[in-house]
């Protein structure tokens, strides 16, 4: 039997997932890797450790599936977006650590560019706000701060890539230097209307075009792996940034369909169809995928700290031993005890876009307990997502967001999902397969080689596991939102 192998390279771990034709998981492996924090608000990864982790999980997933590499029809890749790597074109060695999407070191540069009115140019061309979140200013920082980097880049000696590009480069032993439209749309360098690297934006950031990878569809045959990676040559035929892969995996293929991925951060996407809508209200517009020479666009809202707030309570405050314990701890109290937790550890994303906000726990009294704090932390994940969806709905006049499909690790938390439905006042639907990010890239890869025949077949494979319906009293909901908004205002512009 033939399978599709999906490589899901995330912010804190690398996964390999093997799917069959019915979207059943036949093999799975996961490996965490080191988070590097050189300075406050700086976040880095070791690119070589990431590649090593992928080699490990590929072999382990194949072993768990009790199959061999020659039974893999194709490989799909999905990845943490915006995270930036620059490496030597000849040796393949990175010249600096990967600068992670959460990293805020270029916030001041973004402010300087905004003061010159450049943010409006970036918004109209890329659909993005001018923020340290995206790859463009990270590339500039490396070129400006690593000795000799700019000269080498101008000579064509260096390659830039987001994580997908780095994976394909290594899988093919440097033969292929590509990215797909979805990842490219998060760099601040792609014109999402012309579908080309934009020379004006490259000039503003002083980035040589020779650094950049070739642009590709999200579902097409790019080439084959080098035999050294898995012992045989395998077709690589799907690439999408993690949130866009999850949108595809959730079968949100029609205009108006929405999903939220609860991972390290939370990422809400709404399918807006085949034409980009540039939103002035701080909602991002991105390319979700390119397939059959057609582009699908989404609105996206990004919450920087979602499930990571639970990780922080576990590791930094040691309130519980395992992240999975958070639900039981939070459920042991009926409410948050008047506590509101704004986890702005690296600033606030959509719709606030405040890099100078910082984390805050407010409302503490002598009767406050770790249970109240844990519940407030869980609620903060849903409340931040509520802010995003409210802004999106206000920006979309032609259709109503009627349900939210959910995935990611924290979507398994029933207390959180019920609270999300209550706050949103709409159904929250969890699918049977919650590894939707990996599944989406598998679908894109499989469609390119005929493993699956059509988008309609993908839609038919999606199955609901549980529907959470809103049940909270109106007055209680309004109080929670009112106090949350007060807390957000206090956390803003802290530094």
From Swiss-Prot:
Keyword terms of this UniProt record: ATP-binding, Glycerol metabolism, Kinase, Nucleotide-binding, Transferase
Binding site for glycerol: 81-82, 133, 242-243
General function of this protein: Key enzyme in the regulation of glycerol uptake and metabolism. Catalyzes the phosphorylation of glycerol to yield sn-glycerol 3-phosphate.
GO cellular component labels: cytosol
Organism (species): Borrelia hermsii (strain HS1 / DAH)
Cross-referenced InterPro entries: ATPase_NBD, Carb_kinase_FGGY, Carb_kinase_FGGY_CS, FGGY_C, FGGY_N, Glycerol_kin
Record-listed E.C. numbers: 2.7.1.30
Keyword Cell membrane: no
Pfam family, one: FGGY_C
Activity regulation (UniProt): Inhibited by fructose 1,6-bisphosphate (FBP).
Top-level taxonomic group: Bacteria
Protein name: Glycerol kinase
